[in-house]
Amino acid sequence: MGCLWGLALPLFFFCWEVGVSGSSAGPSTRRADTAMTTDDTEVPAMTLAPGHAALETQTLSAETSSRASTPAGPIPEAETRGAKRISPARETRSFTKTSPNFMVLIATSVETSAASGSPEGAGMTTVQTITGSDPREAIFDTLCTDDSSEEAKTLTMDILTLAHTSTEAKGLSSESSASSDSPHPVITPSRASESSASSDGPHPVITPSRASESSASSDGPHPVITPSRASESSASSDGPHPVITPSRASESSASSDGPHPVITPSRASESSASSDGPHPVITPSRASESSASSDGPHPVITPSRASESSASSDGPHPVITPSRASESSASSDGPHPVITPSRASESSASSDGLHPVITPSRASESSASSDGPHPVITPSRASESSASSDGPHPVITPSWSPGSDVTLLAEALVTVTNIEVINCSITEIETTTSSIPGASDTDLIPTEGVKASSTSDPPALPDSTEAKPHITEVTASAETLSTAGTTESAAPDATVGTPLPTNSATEREVTAPGATTLSGALVTVSRNPLEETSALSVETPSYVKVSGAAPVSIEAGSAVGKTTSFAGSSASSYSPSEAALKNFTPSETPTMDIATKGPFPTSRDPLPSVPPTTTNSSRGTNSTLAKITTSAKTTMKPPTATPTTARTRPTTDVSAGENGGFLLLRLSVASPEDLTDPRVAERLMQQLHRELHAHAPHFQVSLLRVRRG
């Protein structure tokens, strides 16, 4: 009985444990789904691939329960409800929308009018350039109307730059006066003005001017030099040193009583020279009347060109009188030559000393006097100036005028502009603005991606000048459009560089009143998503029409264009273009049905820096353009056909059965060749076979015998 109770109590406790365990495990058996815990985790992640992918991770938790009851020994009971883990693979998808091949024709019309003249001594030159419509409209109409899908939302125009260059110079023609009696130099720069300077010292008085009136006289032992242009000038010297008064487009006269030459160059004037000394009297002129007489033992040389000139010499040296469209007179009583060249000016020079009197002038009137032992130099251009020196140091009065000769001190304002197009909208970013001073005959700074404007201002006049302004304008503008290529959303690398340096040379004399230039750029861009590099071809046609008396020759190529005018102006432009586009299309590797979203980053190299380029102006620019055109032409010589006359006569009639038959022909051929030669006979049979094959394709021709008739 005690043993039964001893067995009954453990059994009772065992049943009790089983009942409790069954009550707790019953709902788990019936509703297993509710006891499981499911964690859905969405983890966005950036990958190194050229795209943006979302990584989704789903994790099902594992729950383990262990229950044990040991009635007599350990009876473990373990239940693992389930462990499930889903780790999808990482996937990267990139959508690339490639636009179809397109062609952009950019037509730009440039009209240039140039006029030159110098009314009332004040030079004026106007150059105006009118550029046609903005070619950006053609590009946007082509690129932004083809496709507006969701994948092609990001449209990037790598390079769409406008290089607009304008040069505008305004010169003020004024009258100014400056005087100095101090022993230190007085420098009075002016532009297109009238200036006067006086100096009584032993040092030179220098008064350069252009298109002005100048005169120079010297009583000291040093030269008095008075160069002028398009002016009237006079120079006299009583000292032992030369008085030099060059003139151009003026009338000049020079006399010398000393042992040194009196030189009076003139052009476009009438000139005469006389010499009583032992040295030559030289009077060059052009386009004038010339005559020369010599009583000395040396030759009298009188070159003239459509001119009148006179020269006389009583000394032992030659009298040389070249003339050019000028009137000049020179007399010399000393032992040295009297040289009187003149050019379209009036000048007079007299010398009583031992040194030459030289009176060059050019379209100006200048006066200079010096009483000291040092030279008085008075060059003038486009201004009226007078200079006298009484002190020991030089008085320098330079003046400039952009009217007669365009020589400008320019300051260029360079602005680099990058135009970026996103979703067919213009975003203009101004990056760099710099000021570049410089001096050139024609300042023109066209660079790719650069808007440059060059404005020449005259230097500041001193406080002691009185200015009467006369406005002279020089305006030149040019506009260049460069379209290199386009890239779209999934193009990581795109590098385009098109440097456009331009050299331009322009002279003063422009005889063509109007010029019309029609230039265009044909840009063809081919896009293929399966290729890595897309093709880019650029063609630039050019057409130039010049109205006026100046003949113009045009040589146009794909990279180098040369324009040469016989009117004294030459321009050469060098514009190489280099473009490279790289498109990279990543491969698609789908693993599971996971949606990939997000924009794709596009890597683009920055624009190459373009240094500003200043132009070099020179007269007679020699540009060599080597253009090689290879024409592949294949000339096929037809086979030598022997003129034959064949008569066909059927000799045997054979009825063709179901399987066909044969036809025996006898040909009588009249030929200058020997048909008994196997090669000639074979050629004849081939010709006959071709003729028969055109009518009946299934014919077979065989030659039995050739007999000479």
UniProtKB/Swiss-Prot annotation:
<feature type="compositionally biased region" description="Low complexity">
    <location>
        <begin position="342"/>
        <end position="351"/>
    </location>
</feature>
<feature type="repeat" description="1">
    <location>
        <begin position="173"/>
        <end position="192"/>
    </location>
</feature>
<feature type="compositionally biased region" description="Basic and acidic residues">
    <location>
        <begin position="78"/>
        <end position="92"/>
    </location>
</feature>
<dbReference type="GO" id="GO:0048012">
    <property type="term" value="P:hepatocyte growth factor receptor signaling pathway"/>
</dbReference>
<feature type="glycosylation site" description="N-linked (GlcNAc...) asparagine">
    <location>
        <position position="622"/>
    </location>
</feature>
<feature type="compositionally biased region" description="Polar residues">
    <location>
        <begin position="474"/>
        <end position="489"/>
    </location>
</feature>
<dbReference type="GO" id="GO:0009925">
    <property type="term" value="C:basal plasma membrane"/>
</dbReference>
<feature type="compositionally biased region" description="Low complexity">
    <location>
        <begin position="304"/>
        <end position="313"/>
    </location>
</feature>
<feature type="repeat" description="5">
    <location>
        <begin position="250"/>
        <end position="268"/>
    </location>
</feature>
<feature type="region of interest" description="Disordered">
    <location>
        <begin position="170"/>
        <end position="403"/>
    </location>
</feature>
<feature type="compositionally biased region" description="Low complexity">
    <location>
        <begin position="323"/>
        <end position="332"/>
    </location>
</feature>
<keyword id="KW-0966">Cell projection</keyword>
<feature type="signal peptide">
    <location>
        <begin position="1"/>
        <end position="25"/>
    </location>
</feature>
<feature type="region of interest" description="Disordered">
    <location>
        <begin position="583"/>
        <end position="657"/>
    </location>
</feature>
<keyword id="KW-1003">Cell membrane</keyword>
<keyword id="KW-0677">Repeat</keyword>
<feature type="glycosylation site" description="N-linked (GlcNAc...) asparagine">
    <location>
        <position position="423"/>
    </location>
</feature>
<feature type="compositionally biased region" description="Low complexity">
    <location>
        <begin position="380"/>
        <end position="389"/>
    </location>
</feature>
<keyword id="KW-0732">Signal</keyword>
<feature type="region of interest" description="12 X 20 AA approximate tandem repeats of S-S-E-S-S-A-S-S-D-S-P-H-P-V-I-T-P-S-R-A">
    <location>
        <begin position="173"/>
        <end position="400"/>
    </location>
</feature>
<feature type="compositionally biased region" description="Low complexity">
    <location>
        <begin position="266"/>
        <end position="275"/>
    </location>
</feature>
<dbReference type="GO" id="GO:0005796">
    <property type="term" value="C:Golgi lumen"/>
</dbReference>
<feature type="region of interest" description="Involved in oligomerization">
    <location>
        <begin position="450"/>
        <end position="656"/>
    </location>
</feature>
<feature type="compositionally biased region" description="Low complexity">
    <location>
        <begin position="361"/>
        <end position="370"/>
    </location>
</feature>
<feature type="compositionally biased region" description="Low complexity">
    <location>
        <begin position="228"/>
        <end position="237"/>
    </location>
</feature>
<feature type="repeat" description="6">
    <location>
        <begin position="269"/>
        <end position="287"/>
    </location>
</feature>
<dbReference type="GO" id="GO:0016324">
    <property type="term" value="C:apical plasma membrane"/>
</dbReference>
<feature type="region of interest" description="Interaction with MET">
    <location>
        <begin position="657"/>
        <end position="709"/>
    </location>
</feature>
<feature type="glycosylation site" description="N-linked (GlcNAc...) asparagine">
    <location>
        <position position="616"/>
    </location>
</feature>
<feature type="region of interest" description="Disordered">
    <location>
        <begin position="434"/>
        <end position="515"/>
    </location>
</feature>
<dbReference type="GO" id="GO:0031528">
    <property type="term" value="C:microvillus membrane"/>
</dbReference>
<feature type="repeat" description="8">
    <location>
        <begin position="307"/>
        <end position="325"/>
    </location>
</feature>
<keyword id="KW-0325">Glycoprotein</keyword>
<dbReference type="InterPro" id="IPR034551">
    <property type="entry name" value="MUC20"/>
</dbReference>
<feature type="repeat" description="4">
    <location>
        <begin position="231"/>
        <end position="249"/>
    </location>
</feature>
<feature type="repeat" description="2">
    <location>
        <begin position="193"/>
        <end position="211"/>
    </location>
</feature>
<keyword id="KW-0472">Membrane</keyword>
<feature type="compositionally biased region" description="Low complexity">
    <location>
        <begin position="209"/>
        <end position="218"/>
    </location>
</feature>
<feature type="repeat" description="9">
    <location>
        <begin position="326"/>
        <end position="344"/>
    </location>
</feature>
<keyword id="KW-0964">Secreted</keyword>
<dbReference type="GO" id="GO:0005576">
    <property type="term" value="C:extracellular region"/>
</dbReference>
<feature type="compositionally biased region" description="Low complexity">
    <location>
        <begin position="285"/>
        <end position="294"/>
    </location>
</feature>
